[in-house]
């Protein structure tokens, strides 16, 4: 197992800069490269700008601002020869197969013989990424899928190909665990790997059934939240956080690579309501609001929620669903409650948990890996199989029928 003493990150967007920051936090020197800017004379302006944003971003990607000094900015036109100094090159560019493969060919010309190359892809299978690449490149290639923000989200999904050398895998696992403080989960080379494969279906059913069952945004989030061991953002708050406009892209990428027979294909429905929100710029926290927004009334900030029927905002209300109160007694009490909240909880949980169960061993060899991925990638308190245990496996199987 070789050591990683210098790293290159190619792509200085939100994820790339976050990964570079976490590597720097580990006391490792980082080269951060990006494309040339369209305007201006500073050819390194994009990477330099990313480093400056690290110093201002909240929550802070850097443990201390001095760690920024470990990051050397550059560009992919002038500085690819710097890769010869690096033990690990992490690609974090746009999710476009042609762009990634063209970059790999350039990386292969400059990397040293022992250097490992990884991709932070979340949707493109490893087998597609290395198609047409030489044997040595394939032997030193893997997927290292970080979650945003990289400093705070503990999951690192590690995917090896059939040609990836065992020592490459062990080096990456040790680096992720010991140096970056990650929970490293071995995944199979399947669409969305583990966390996003399950997470995208979960988000899809939670949104679709909220519309179908006539729940308000506040009611849905009160169910898809503490009662299920999911962060208080719930489902609609989570979409606001990650960016509503990203969902159609993630969904289309997933649909392009999923098997022909898959539950997600059956439940996926494009939402005209959400498409209209995106067109209006209501993309969540980074836009002019989303399912929630902060509005100023009489000099005070007021949290408002979107009406899923009218598309108008109103002051956000606490949920009065009796099922939420019942959920304090346990998960089964929640899903057995007869009100629309209890019915909604069961529809979301039954689809999500049965989907997760059906994917083993397709996406991972062990159910523990699935639980760890959802807990550390989506911040669930319990993984899918732990949720089944809380409900009771026999009870759950019987209720499904």
Which residue ranges define each predicted feature?
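N-terminal glycine-rich phosphate-binding loop for ADP-containing cofactors
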Residues: 1-401
């Amino acid at each position: 197992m070789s050591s990683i003493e210098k790293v290159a990150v190619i792509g200085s967007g939100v994820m790339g800069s976050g990964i570079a920051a976490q590597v720097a936090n580990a006391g490792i020197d980082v080269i951060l490269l990006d494309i040339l800017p369209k305007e201006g004379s500073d050819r390194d302006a994009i990477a330099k700008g990313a480093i400056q944003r690290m110093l201002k971003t909240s929550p802070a990607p850097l443990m201390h601002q001095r760690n920024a000094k470990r990051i050397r900015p550059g560009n992919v036109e002038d500085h690819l020869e710097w890769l010869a100094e690096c033990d690990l090159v992490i690609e974090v560019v746009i999710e476009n197969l042609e762009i990634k493969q063209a970059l790999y060919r350039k990386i292969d010309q400059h990397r040293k013989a022992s250097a490992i190359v990884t991709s932070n892809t979340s949707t493109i299978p490893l087998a597609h990424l290395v198609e047409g690449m030489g044997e040595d490149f394939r032997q030193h290639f893997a997927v290292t899928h970080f979650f945003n923000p990289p400093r705070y989200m503990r999951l690192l999904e590690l995917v090896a190909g059939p040609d990836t050398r065992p020592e490459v895998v062990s080096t990456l696992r040790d680096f992720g665990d010991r140096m970056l403080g990650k929970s490293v989960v071995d995944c199979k080379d399947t669409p969305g790997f583990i966390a996003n494969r399950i997470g995208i279906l979960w988000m899809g059913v939670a949104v679709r059934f909220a519309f179908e069952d006539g729940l308000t945004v506040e009611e849905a989030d009160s169910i898809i939240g503490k009662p299920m061991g999911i962060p208080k953002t719930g489902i609609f708050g989570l979409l606001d956080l990650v960016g509503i406009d990203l969902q159609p892209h993630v969904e289309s990428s997933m649909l392009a690579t999923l098997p022909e027979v898959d539950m997600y294909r059956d439940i996926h429905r494009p939402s005209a309501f959400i498409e209209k929100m995106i067109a209006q710029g209501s993309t969540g926290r980074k836009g002019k609001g989303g399912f929630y927004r902060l509005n100023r009334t009489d000099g005070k900030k007021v949290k408002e929620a979107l009406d899923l029927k009218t598309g108008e905002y109103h002051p956000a209300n606490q949920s009065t669903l009796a099922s939420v109160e019942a959920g304090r007694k346990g998960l089964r009490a929640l899903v057995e409650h007869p009100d629309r909240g209890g019915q909604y909880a069961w529809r979301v949980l039954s689809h999500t948990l049965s989907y997760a169960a059906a994917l083993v061993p397709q996406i991972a060899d062990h159910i523990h890996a699935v639980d760890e991925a959802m807990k550390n990638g989506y911040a669930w308190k319990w993984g899918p199989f732990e949720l089944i245990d809380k409900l009771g496996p026999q009870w759950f199987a019987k209720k499904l029928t």
